[in-house]
Amino acid sequence: GIPCGESCVYIPCITAAIGCSCKSKVCYRN
């Protein structure tokens, strides 16, 4: 639920490397 400061509209979350995932076109962590 914490925004990672990255969008995932066109590309996957690079921040997935630290546990972020795409939700509603924005990368979140928990």
Curated annotation (Swiss-Prot):
Keyword field: Disulfide bond, Plant defense
GO BP, sorted A to Z: defense response
Disulfide bonds: 4-20, 8-22, 13-27
Cross-link for Cyclopeptide (Gly-Asn), residue positions: 1-30
PROSITE patterns (UniProt xref): CYCLOTIDE (PS51052), CYCLOTIDE_BRACELET (PS60008)
Keyword hit for Acyltransferase: no
Family: Belongs to the cyclotide family. Bracelet subfamily.
Swiss-Prot/TrEMBL domain comment: The presence of a 'disulfide through disulfide knot' structurally defines this protein as a knottin.
Function recorded in the entry: Probably participates in a plant defense mechanism.
Designated name of the protein: Cyclotide mden-E
Species this chain originates from: Melicytus dentatus (Tree violet)
